[in-house]
Curated annotation (Swiss-Prot):
Protein species of origin: Ictalurid herpesvirus 1 (strain Auburn) (IcHV-1)
UniProt protein name: Uncharacterized protein ORF52
Highest taxon of source: Viruses
Length: 318
């Protein structure tokens, strides 16, 4: 199914050069107190960057209203300045729009944005709104609902009822970090090879996936793993995980090389199991040791036999 309208280009990212930030002095007593508390909790960082404590005196000339855009901009900028002195270092910050002092700070070095030192001030609410807006612009409603309501990675294998959410498989998908991405792509490829309906659905999702990941806003979507509070944005994080996996899947399908190994079975040493599952009382889909046929079922963790490795536990057999 083809798209009828192009997806709009949306960024919603405010870029500010750290070296040229001229934030106003924050003279509100409550703001100063809380910033000072932050400095007190990070004395080594403050000393290394020459960050002084702020005066607790309230100036009568203050025109900054608490929780105003100016106060928000100042406090976010201040926190970034405390964290890094090097203007060539990239700092990414997500700040909720509701309360300037209850924002969660998350930073990372992001070295490929521009040639100059920049700070990305990402308004979390705005980012979420604009990503959802991109999704709404798609006309493949049936395929998108299939993607978000029934996990595209696991529902094909386990005949998932797409009318309900399955928390067990959502937990599995949240482990699809870039390091484990290939395993998820292999499962998806295996399913598409054996099920024409799945293959057709994936074909209809291809244009949508490629349009989404070409959006400027998705230049940062791989960072959402650590930056968006999971308890409030879990569904969106799952969307982004699936887009990552689908993108990788379509890249492989375009290329003539494919995976390094022809076999889709795990290595002889066993299948690495994420540490989060070691004591988990859930059933997950895990391929068995390659001495047995590939298994497309749900196996409780307690039924697995383990091999203790140097740095990980591995599923050896069922």
């Amino acid at each position: 199914m083809e798209q009828q309208n192009p997806i709009p280009i949306i960024t919603s990212i405010t870029v500010t050069n750290i070296s040229s930030v001229a934030a106003p002095h924050c003279t509100h007593l409550c703001q100063k107190t809380r910033i000072n508390k932050y400095i007190d909790r990070h004395p080594a960082i403050a000393r290394a960057n020459g960050t002084p404590r702020l005066s607790a005196k309230k100036s009568p000339s203050s025109n900054i209203v608490p929780n105003s855009p100016a106060a928000t901009r100042f406090s976010v900028t201040r926190a970034a300045a405390i964290r890094t002195r090097n203007v060539t270092e990239r700092v990414i910050i997500i700040a909720p729009v509701t309360n300037v002092f209850r924002f969660r700070i998350a930073w990372t070095r992001f070295r490929s944005l521009t040639s100059n030192g920049v700070m990305l001030i990402i308004n979390q609410e705005s980012v979420l709104y604009n990503i959802r807006d991109i999704f709404r612009a798609c006309t493949i409603d049936e395929e998108w609902n299939y993607l978000i309501r029934g996990n595209i990675i696991y529902s094909p294998l386990l005949d998932w009822d797409i009318s309900t959410e399955n928390e067990q498989h959502s937990s599995v998908l949240l482990l699809a970090t870039p390091a484990r991405e290939k395993s998820f792509v292999r499962l998806l490829e295996k399913a598409s090879d054996h099920n024409p309906e799945i293959r057709n659905r994936l074909g209809r999702l291809r244009a949508f996936t490629e349009s989404c990941v070409s959006q400027p806003i998705f230049n940062i979507f791989t960072l959402f793993n650590a930056m968006i509070p999971l308890e409030s944005c879990k569904k969106l994080v799952l969307f982004l995980r699936q887009l990552q996996i689908l993108q990788r899947y379509f890249v492989i399908k375009k290329s003539t090389v494919g995976f390094e190994s022809v076999s889709l079975e795990p290595d002889a040493a066993g299948v690495p199991l994420p540490p989060e599952f070691i004591d988990a009382a859930v059933a997950v889909q895990i391929p068995p040791h390659k001495t047995t046929p590939w298994f497309f079922g749900v196996v409780p963790i307690g039924m697995c036999r383990w091999k203790e490795g140097v740095s990980k536990r591995e599923v050896v057999s069922f």
